[in-house]
């Protein structure tokens, strides 16, 4: 039985030791390579120095660094805060460049108009006749019609010449005005005469219609986005990426590639994503696509507007002008021709669509065709809409599509275009009114890099590549392979180390300064390897933040005059303080846990989920953070509570430690609390005596005894107290008195002291007896329960004593063995030394015997 008890005792000891050693605590790591999706404002940088872009963006320092990461991330070009932000920002740049700024409320009057159809001209007749033919006309730089401005097929718009009366500078007199309008911009009613109609402007009552203050140029501008310090940009580096990929290899970059701000429908111009291949970004839920065209085919577009234009101002009311243009044969017209191998480029687009995993239509290339929208659509959808040097061109692409698709009918590699003043906004619903085209020749050249289209197929027989007017799709292609993330350098993980326990120092590694991007260089490493470099990581993070802050401050200082009144200037200044706020927020959070300025901070908080533990050798910090993100709120609360309790304990400890210093005993401020307490006790005793005196006096008054109102000698009257109630020893009469030693005299005030003492004594006796009875009853009740609990401690004491006796016996045996071995060794050594010492004597004795 004793052996069983010993085994049980040893088992309990091992279990308790294992339970203590196997317990994990929350450890806070600062500087881990982890992140989460973000949607903060970005700021832009550009190389332009001579355009309006310099007042919108900061100067570009050409710092484009890229680091490959061995991890995966989900990307979606359409569910992307960066592309949405780019759409809004480009619209802001667009509005800043050619923004209408004067409300156009006049001209909401009845106008008498004469319809002047331009189809009666010779050119239009020739053009109409040519529409019925199927000839092919191709232009190049050497074509004579380009130099003479006589290329056939430039259609003429239907124009209406109108007259109206409005009050001018003299409010009591009306003035007659003349103006020329496009037919589609007016709503007309039949007049009294056959050639006369009553017309109104369609959009005269729309409050958002405005007139431009001044004529501006819309120059080509390229800029790139930059992430504020504390944030990073991830780019999908997979050639199979098509706008959506849940697992994509990626890299970390400090800022985006250059992005083009060109706005247009149908085609994208001067894009930065053109490669030596054709690829498609396809929306994850519908048929919206943006197709990047192969740069091998050198697809370009050249637009030209003939000169000799005249703009006439019309003063409608005092201080407000409306600019008009006299009617002529070709009002507000231009034309664009296309160069490059368009036929093979569109053929490659069809092949790419056929091989795309999202496509399930016909595989016959001849049944996949490039189509346009119906004629009832908006002008920006029905025509190719683009901006050329600040003018809005609407180009009829019918001849061009016939040429590319090799259809029947007139085939031309150029399109006729018209310049409009009333333009539908592409970012929001509304219209703007701009000045008429400037005088002189207008031309612009662009590289065609993408095609905006909806791919529709109903069955396996026909597929339409319908060109689209979604301008925002251009920025899905430009920036759809990026995503913005916020660096989350604070992480939690369970370790067996508790706060204030000794830790084996780690070998320090050399710090390689990689800049801010080097912070994420270990994102693909295992947690154990990444945690070894947390000191370097956190220093790199702070150094990168400070460096980027300094660079941003420098460029803002250089541009502060230009940035004073711009919206983008405000955004750039806002980005300056984003990172430092984030860093201070992280440090404040670490400070609330008692981990300020520590890379690895062990705590006393037990790990909340023992079944969830990291694989330090195979798991990255990003993977671990995804698993424990739902525990962050609980862990944060526990850490804050533990830190509050720790601060309370430290405060109490400091209060006790202050008496360790001998000089503190003579500090008057240290004794003030005790002096105050002593005064309170004295005052309490005095008040208690007064209260007892009053109570005693009232009690005596109720009995009819009133010593208070007696004469002063009554205060000293004696109260006889018998010493012995038996018969007095001396027989004396009552008159003669007796032995004075048999009585004691007490002042009556003493009884006031005896009364509270007796009451206090009775109260203490009652409390003592009650507590003793309660403890006795409790002990008797718990006796059966405590009896089994005495055995384990008894076994433990027995085991400890047995273990001590065994150790003592082993020590005695070892001591005796060592002593015996020492005595034996000493004897052997002594005999050996004696023999060695006797050698000379033996030699001498031998020599003497030999001589004898």
From Swiss-Prot:
Residues 1-24 form the signal peptide. Residues 461-467 are annotated as: V5. Residues 655-676 are annotated as: MPER. The chain crosses the membrane at residues 678-698. Keywords: AIDS, Apoptosis, Clathrin-mediated endocytosis of virus by host, Cleavage on pair of basic residues, Coiled coil, Disulfide bond, Fusion of virus membrane with host endosomal membrane, Fusion of virus membrane with host membrane, Glycoprotein, Host cell membrane, Host endosome, Host membrane, Host-virus interaction, Inhibition of host innate immune response by virus, Inhibition of host tetherin by virus, Lipoprotein, Membrane, Palmitate, Signal, Transmembrane, Transmembrane helix, Viral attachment to host cell, Viral envelope protein, Viral immunoevasion, Viral penetration into host cytoplasm, Virion, Virus endocytosis by host, Virus entry into host cell. Residues 162-204 are annotated as: V2. Residues 699-852 are cytoplasmic. Residues 510-530 are annotated as: Fusion peptide. A motif (Di-leucine internalization motif) lies at residues 851-852. A motif (YXXV motif) lies at residues 705-708. Residues 113-161 are annotated as: V1. Residues 622-648 form a coiled coil. One of its GO terms (biological process) is symbiont-mediated suppression of host innate immune response. The record marks 509-510 as: Cleavage. Residues 713-740 are annotated as: Disordered. Residues 573-589 are annotated as: Immunosuppression. Residues 303-335 are annotated as: V3. One of its GO terms (molecular function) is structural molecule activity. Glycans are attached at residues 37, 70, 114, 148, 195, 205, 237, 247, 270, 276, 287, 298, 341, 364, 396, 406, 445, 461, 464, 609, 618, 634. Disulfide bonds join 44-57, 101-213, 108-204, 113-162, 236-248, 303-336, 388-444, 395-417. Some of the most genetically diverse regions of the viral genome are present in Env. They are called variable regions 1 through 5 (V1 through V5). Coreceptor usage of gp120 is determined mainly by the primary structure of the third variable region (V3) in the outer domain of gp120. Binding to CCR5 involves a region adjacent in addition to V3. Some HIV-2 isolates have been described that can infect cells independently of CD4, using CXCR4 as primary receptor. These isolates may have an exposed coreceptor binding site. The surface protein gp120 (SU) attaches the virus to the host lymphoid cell by binding to the primary receptor CD4. This interaction induces a structural rearrangement creating a high affinity binding site for a chemokine coreceptor like CXCR4 and/or CCR5. This peculiar 2 stage receptor-interaction strategy allows gp120 to maintain the highly conserved coreceptor-binding site in a cryptic conformation, protected from neutralizing antibodies. Since CD4 also displays a binding site for the disulfide-isomerase P4HB/PDI, a P4HB/PDI-CD4-CXCR4-gp120 complex may form. This is Envelope glycoprotein gp160. It comes from Human immunodeficiency virus type 2 subtype B (isolate EHO) (HIV-2). The gene is env.
């Amino acid at each position: 039985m004793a052996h069983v008890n010993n085994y049980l005792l040893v088992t309990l000891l091992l279990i308790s030791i294992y339970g203590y050693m196997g317990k994990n605590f929350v450890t806070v790591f600062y500087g881990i390579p982890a992140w989460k999706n973000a949607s903060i404002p970005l700021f832009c940088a550009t190389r332009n120095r001579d355009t309006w872009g310099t007042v919108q963006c900061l100067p570009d320092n050409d710092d484009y660094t890229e680091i490959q990461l061995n991890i995966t991330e989900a990307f979606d070009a359409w569910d992307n805060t960066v592309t949405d932000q780019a759409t809004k920002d480009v619209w802001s740049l667009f509005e800043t460049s050619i923004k209408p700024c004067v409300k156009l409320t006049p001209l909401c009057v009845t106008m008498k108009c004469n319809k002047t159809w331009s189809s009666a001209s010779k050119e239009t007749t020739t053009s109409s006749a040519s529409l019925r033919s199927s000839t092919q006309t191709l232009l190049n730089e050497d074509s004579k019609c380009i130099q003479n401005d006589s290329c056939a097929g430039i259609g003429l718009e239907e124009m209406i010449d109108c007259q109206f009366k409005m009050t001018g500078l003299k409010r009591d007199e009306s003035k007659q005005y003349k103006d020329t309008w496009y037919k589609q911009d007016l709503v007309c009613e039949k007049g009294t005469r056959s050639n006369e109609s009553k017309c109104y402007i369609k959009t005269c009552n729309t409050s958002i219609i405005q007139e431009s203050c001044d004529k501006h140029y819309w120059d080509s501008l390229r800029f790139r986005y930059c992430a504020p310090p504390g944030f990073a940009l991830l780019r999908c580096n997979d050639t199979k990426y098509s706008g959506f990929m849940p697992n994509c290899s990626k890299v970390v970059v400090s800022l985006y590639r250059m992005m083009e701000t060109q706005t247009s429908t149908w085609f994208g111009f001067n894009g930065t994503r053109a490669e030596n291949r054709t690829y498609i970004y396809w929306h994850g839920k519908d048929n919206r696509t943006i197709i990047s065209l192969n740069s091998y085919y050198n697809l370009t577009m050249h637009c030209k507007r003939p000169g000799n234009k005249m703009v006439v101002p019309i003063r409608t009311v005092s201080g407000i002008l409306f600019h008009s243009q006299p009617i002529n044969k070709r009002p507000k017209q231009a034309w664009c021709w296309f160069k490059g191998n368009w036929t093979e480029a569109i053929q490659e687009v069809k092949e790419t669509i056929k091989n795309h995993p999202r496509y399930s239509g016909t595989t016959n290339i001849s049944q996949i065709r490039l189509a346009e929208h119906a004629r009832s659509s908006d002008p920006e959808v029905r025509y190719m809409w683009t901006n050329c040097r600040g003018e809005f061109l609407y180009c009829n692409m019918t001849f061009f599509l016939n040429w590319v698709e090799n259809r029947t009918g007139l085939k031309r590699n150029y399109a006729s275009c018209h310049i409009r003043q009333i333009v539908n906004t592409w970012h929001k619903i509304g219209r703007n009114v701009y000045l008429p085209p400037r005088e002189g020749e207008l031309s612009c050249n662009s590289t065609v890099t993408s095609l905006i289209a909806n791919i529709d197929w109903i069955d396996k027989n026909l597929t339409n590549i319908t060109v689209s007017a979604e301008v925002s799709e251009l920025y899905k292609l430009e920036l759809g392979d990026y995503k913005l993330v916020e660096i989350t350098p604070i992480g939690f993980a369970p370790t067996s180390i508790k706060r204030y326990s000794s830790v084996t120092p780690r070998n320090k590694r050399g710090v390689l300064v990689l800049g801010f991007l080097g912070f994420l260089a270990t994102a693909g490493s295992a947690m154990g390897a990444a945690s070894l470099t947390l000191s370097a990581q956190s220093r790199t993070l702070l150094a990168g933040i400070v460096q980027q802050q300094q660079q941003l401050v420098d460029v803002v200082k250089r541009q502060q005059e230009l940035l004073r009144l711009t919206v983008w200037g405000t955004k750039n200044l806002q980005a300056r303080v984003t990172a430092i706020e984030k860093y201070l927020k992280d440090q404040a959070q670490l400070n609330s846990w008692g981990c300020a300025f520590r890379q690895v901070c062990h705590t006393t908080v037990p790990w909340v989920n023992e079944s969830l533990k990291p694989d330090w050798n195979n798991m990255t910090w990003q993977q671990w953070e995804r698993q424990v993100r739902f525990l962050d709120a609980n862990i944060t609360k526990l850490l804050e509570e533990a830190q509050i309790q720790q601060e309370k304990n430290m405060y109490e400890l400091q209060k006790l430690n202050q008496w360790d210093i001998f000089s503190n005993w003579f500090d008057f401020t240290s004794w003030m609390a005790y002096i105050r307490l002593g005064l309170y006790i004295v005052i309490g005793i005095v008040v208690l005596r007064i209260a007892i005196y009053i109570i005693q006096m009232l009690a005596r008054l109720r009995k009819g005894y009133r010593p208070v109102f007696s004469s002063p000698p009554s205060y000293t009257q004696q109260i006889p107290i018998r010493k012995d109630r038996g018969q007095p020893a001396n027989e004396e009469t009552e008159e003669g008195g007796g032995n004075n030693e048999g009585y004691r005299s007490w002042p009556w005030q003493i009884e006031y002291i005896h009364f509270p003492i007796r009451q206090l004594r009775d109260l203490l006796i009652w409390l003592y007896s009650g507590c003793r009875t309660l403890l006795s009853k409790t002990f008797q009740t718990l006796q059966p329960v405590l009896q089994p609990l005495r055995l384990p401690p008894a076994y433990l004491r027995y085991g400890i004593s047995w273990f001590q006796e065994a150790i003592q016996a082993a020590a005695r045996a070892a001591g005796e063995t060592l002593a015996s071995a020492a005595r034996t060794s000493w004897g052997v050594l002594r005999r050996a030394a004696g023999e060695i010492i006797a050698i000379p004597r033996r030699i001498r004795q031998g020599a003497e015997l030999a001589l004898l």
